């Protein structure tokens, strides 16, 4: 079974598909023994059991009955994780290979249980809307929100906050008048203060919820008309904005009120706060930039030099909100609809720690916002939302392994079980994590430490079990269980054959991003270079001090170029990006699966020509030809680039002449392929149509390996375009790598 087939079945890809036998051997591998796991990955033939799972009785284990368990005919099963013997359920007595229960079937290495435990509350959606925006932007946002109401479950509980200079909490239960409670936008309120203000007697005390805070969250089917009317009648914040000033915007206060209101009403139940912001917070708490336009918003340079005077204070405020949200199992989604930065860099942990969406768009009028937001409410074949709520993620391991940590949109539950390693990678010190929200695309990097210190017999097995508890949109609690077995070996040849360079590249990319949040950018680049050199010194074939002897086996041959493109990517090279853009890009990479992550790291390039089939080509400047059309997919952008000759023919209108039908077809082919890429992509990519000499051609040139540059004229003319850059090409990068490896440098 190849790596992709295993991923299709279990949603798991390992960097090393066999593990080193001892801790000492593991330390020599450079790339950690880690896995990328997509808990809710769609699988058409997923085994589903409509009963509760059977757990190991060892209180320090509690792993779940699975196909790797040894079944004793006398009526017991032996747990492969801890070795404990457990009694089989009475109705499983006398089972055989011909009548195995579903969870013991060899095809049930991944299985989902629908438990008998009911969900007390439907999912909760809490809209938080910025009114400091122009009428066109606000109008487009209102229209999209009204459309989204038709996509929510009818029983979903809905709440609404609008804010500008003040924060308004809307009482949707008030039928006769539109009623709201006003909070100051420049004040941080405690739970008690919010409770005291909102629990004051209301106009209609006869209603059951009259004096309860739950009256601010009502079933959509009961308040849809009222809510639609409120949304349609929202207007721009009336607070005057003086010349030379920014609007007084209270995003931090609005999020503070929303977080505390949910904390007081629905602790431990699935809820999403959806923030729609059109600019930066200019009021404390959570201030991003001062109200005077003469004060510029912070840049990467300001942050690096510690010149961003509001940055650390804002991060501290939003991180405190994130901690409360995680404790309550609530999620935050942030949608930006403006050219300005809104403060995503400061607010990113609201989404990163809760599994929420971070979406950057130029305006709420754009398709990127509209379609991406509505795709968040995609449904499965039974009509249920493709989003989970209120989840936990447990990692069980046999005694040979320990959990080093996790990197992804999750938070630690701080449960230090006996399989937790002291060597932390990412979010460590635990084997249990909170997944406030997840989708079928959410992927988590899990890292393991080899605990074994002694040699083992050949073909010794280790076991890993991933257990994901979550609230399903249908109103049931479910448990997704994946159990994996890996061989432990001391032979380098077997380890080499088991290396998945794609998974390894994505795992190392996640480790690199995690380091980037703590360390200096130059130090991170030096670290990833050292790791690549060490890996090649361990697994490449070469003769010392002889460059031409350097060879990598097919299992490793693409890995250096993945690292090359990662070094050049917007994830690490932040010079041309704002802090908000960097936060957005990194958030998406920490969310997506291997295939999408690789597209982000090393974009794909397809060439189209007359009278020939489309073909993948090198992501290289030599691929630019006058008579070709190129389709670039960076995940965030889909770009169609017309070569010089093609662009001239298009301007001349040849495609409108029936005699040149094949040219018209050539122009249409990349558009059709681009449309197919756009169908399922989340968030929706930006579409760019450009040509040789066009202003937006820079998006293509910035991604290409510059093998033909202004100071390297070896391949000019018809052999490719000249790239105006001082960046090192892949060829030079590989040459330096070979020299360092064969010389024994680090």
UniProtKB/Swiss-Prot annotation:
Question: Quick one: where is this thing mainly located?
Answer: cytoplasm
Which InterPro entries does UniProt cross-reference here? ADF-H/Gelsolin-like_dom_sf, Gelsolin-like_dom, Gelsolin-like_dom_sf, Sec23, Sec23/24_helical_dom, Sec23/24_helical_dom_sf, Sec23/24_trunk_dom, Sec23_24_beta_S
Q: Name the membrane topology term.
A: Peripheral membrane protein
User: What CDD domains does this protein map onto?
Assistant: Sec23_C (cd11287)
Q: What Gene3D superfamilies does the record tag this protein with?
A: beta-sandwich domain of Sec23/24, Sec23/Sec24 helical domain, Severin, von Willebrand factor, type A domain, Zn-finger domain of Sec23/24
Q: Which residues does the annotation say bind Zn(2+)?
A: 56, 61, 79, 82
- Which GO molecular function annotations are given, in alphabetical order? GTPase activator activity; zinc ion binding
Q: What are the entry keywords?
A: Cytoplasm, Cytoplasmic vesicle, Endoplasmic reticulum, ER-Golgi transport, Golgi apparatus, Membrane, Metal-binding, Protein transport, Transport, Zinc
GO cellular component assignments = COPII vesicle coat; endoplasmic reticulum exit site; endoplasmic reticulum membrane; Golgi membrane
Pfam families per the record?
Answer: Gelsolin, Sec23_BS, Sec23_helical, Sec23_trunk, zf-Sec23_Sec24
Question: Which locations, inside or outside the cell, does it occupy?
Answer: Cytoplasm; Cytoplasmic vesicle, COPII-coated vesicle membrane; Endoplasmic reticulum membrane; Golgi apparatus membrane
Q: Name one GO biological process term.
A: intracellular protein transport
Quaternary state and interactors: The COPII coat is composed of at least 5 proteins: the SEC23/24 complex, the SEC13/31 complex, and the protein SAR1.
Its family remark reads: Belongs to the SEC23/SEC24 family. SEC23 subfamily.
PANTHER family (UniProt xref): PROTEIN TRANSPORT PROTEIN SEC23
Give the function comment from the record.
Component of the coat protein complex II (COPII) which promotes the formation of transport vesicles from the endoplasmic reticulum (ER). The coat has two main functions, the physical deformation of the endoplasmic reticulum membrane into vesicles and the selection of cargo molecules.
UniProt name for this protein: Protein transport protein SEC23
Gene that codes for this?
SEC23
């Amino acid at each position: 079974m190849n790596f992709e087939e295993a991923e299709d079945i279990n949603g798991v890809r390992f960097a090393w598909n066999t593990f080193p036998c001892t801790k000492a051997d593991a330390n020599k591998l450079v790339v950690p023994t880690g896995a990328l796991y997509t808990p809710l990955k769609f699988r058409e033939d997923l085994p589903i059991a409509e009963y509760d799972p059977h757990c190991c009785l060892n209180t320090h284990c509690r792993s779940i009955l699975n196909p790797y368990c040894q079944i004793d005919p006398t009526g017991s099963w032996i747990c492969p994780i801890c070795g404990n013997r457990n009694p089989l359920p009475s109705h499983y007595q006398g089972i055989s290979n011909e009548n195995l229960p579903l969870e013991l079937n060899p095809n049930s290495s991944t299985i989902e249980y629908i438990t008998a435990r009911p969900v007390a509350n439907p999912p909760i959606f809490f809209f938080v809307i910025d009114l400091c925006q122009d009428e066109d932007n606000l109008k487009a946002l209102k229209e999209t929100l009204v459309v989204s109401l038709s996509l929510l479950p009818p029983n979903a509980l809905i709440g609404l906050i609008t804010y500008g200079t003040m924060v308004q909490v809307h009482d949707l239960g008030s039928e006769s008048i539109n009623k709201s409670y006003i909070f100051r936008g420049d004040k941080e309120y405690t739970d008690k203060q919010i409770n005291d203000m909102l629990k004051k007697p209301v106009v209609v005390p006869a209603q059951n919820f009259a004096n309860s805070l739950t009256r601010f969250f009502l079933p959509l089917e009961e308040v849809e008309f009222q809510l639609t009317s409120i949304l349609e009648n929202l207007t721009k914040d009336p607070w005057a904005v003086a010349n030379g000033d920014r609007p007084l915007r209270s995003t931090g206060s609005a999020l503070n009120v929303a977080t505390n209101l949910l904390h007081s009403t629905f602790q431990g139940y699935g809820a999403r706060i959806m923030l729609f912001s059109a600019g930066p917070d200019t009021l404390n708490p959570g201030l991003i930039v001062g109200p005077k336009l003469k004060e510029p918003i912070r840049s990467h340079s300001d942050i690096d030099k510690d010149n961003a005077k509001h940055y650390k204070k804002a991060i501290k405020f939003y991180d405190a909100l994130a901690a409360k949200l995680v404790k309550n199992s609530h999620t935050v989604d942030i949608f930006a609809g403006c050219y300005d930065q809104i403060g995503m860099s400061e607010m990113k942990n609201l989404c990163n720690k809760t599994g929420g969406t971070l979406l950057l768009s130029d305006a709420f009028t754009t398709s990127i916002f509209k379609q991406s937001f509505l795709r968040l409410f995609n449904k499965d074949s039974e009509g249920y939302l493709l989003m989970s709520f209120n989840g936990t993620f447990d990692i069980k391991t046999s005694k040979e392994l320990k959990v080093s940590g996790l990197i992804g949109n999750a938070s630690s539950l701080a449960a230090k079980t006996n399989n937790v390693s002291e060597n932390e990678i990412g979010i460590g010190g635990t084997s249990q994590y909170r997944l406030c929200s997840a989708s079928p695309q959410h992927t988590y990097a899990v890292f393991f430490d080899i605990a074994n210190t002694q040699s083992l017999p050949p073909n010794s097995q280790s076991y890993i079990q991933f257990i994901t508890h979550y609230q399903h949109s249908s109103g049931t609690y479910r448990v997704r269980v994946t159990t994996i077995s890996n061989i432990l070996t001391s032979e380098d040849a077997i380890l080499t054959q088991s290396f998945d360079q794609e998974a390894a590249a994505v795992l190392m990319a996640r480790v690199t991003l995690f380091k980037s949040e703590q360390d200096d950018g130059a130090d991170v680049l030096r670290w990833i270079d050292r790791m690549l050199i060490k890996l090649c010194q361990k697994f490449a074939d070469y003769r010392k001090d002889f460059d031409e002897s350097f060879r990598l086996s097919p299992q490793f041959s693409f890995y250096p170029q993945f690292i090359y493109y990662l070094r050049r990517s917007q994830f690490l090279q932040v010079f041309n990006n704002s802090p908000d853009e960097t936060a957005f890009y990194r958030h998406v990479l920490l969310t997506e699966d291997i295939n999408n992550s690789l597209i982000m790291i090393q974009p794909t390039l397809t060439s189209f020509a007359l009278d020939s089939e489309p073909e993948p080509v090198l992501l290289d400047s030599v691929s630019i030809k006058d008579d070709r059309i190129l389709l670039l997919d960076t995940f965030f952008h889909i770009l169609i680039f017309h070569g010089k000759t093609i662009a001239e023919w298009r301007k001349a209108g040849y495609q409108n002449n029936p005699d040149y039908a094949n040219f018209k077809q050539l122009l249409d082919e990349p558009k059709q392929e681009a449309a197919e890429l756009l169908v399922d992509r989340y968030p929706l990519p930006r579409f760019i149509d450009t040509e040789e000499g066009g202003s937006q051609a820079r998006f293509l040139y910035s991604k290409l390996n510059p093998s033909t540059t202004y100071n390297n004229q070896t391949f000019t003319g018809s052999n490719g375009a000249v790239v105006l850059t001082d960046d090192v090409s892949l060829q030079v990068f590989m040459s330096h790598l070979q020299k360092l490896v064969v010389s024994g440098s680090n």
